[in-house]
Amino acid sequence: MSVVLITGARLPQAHALKRSITEHMVVMGDYYELPNLPGNELLFVQLPAPQSPSYIHQFLALCLKLQVSKVCIVDALEYKLLEPARQLFSEYAIDFEYVDGVKISS
């Protein structure tokens, strides 16, 4: 089963997208601090801060650690920063797409 990372976990669009993905393990993440609720450790991850000079490398390292095969980017700022690194991510078999609104994907 492949792992899909959905960014922008604070946004309702991210949760709607999560409900539409049924055939993959879904992990949600955000660079904003998320509430630390018991049992959510595997469902929510803290993403690197976009203003970090090593943002791309930190994001890639996290994807590799979680064995992510696809990143659904809900946050426009993250997409702006990650798009130029698309080739780098593809070399590690990590695909990503910007989700504007909610897409149904399985």
Task: Locate the predicted segments by residue.
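ATP-binding N-terminal substructure of ATP-dependent carboxylate-amine bond-forming enzymes
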Residues: M1-S105
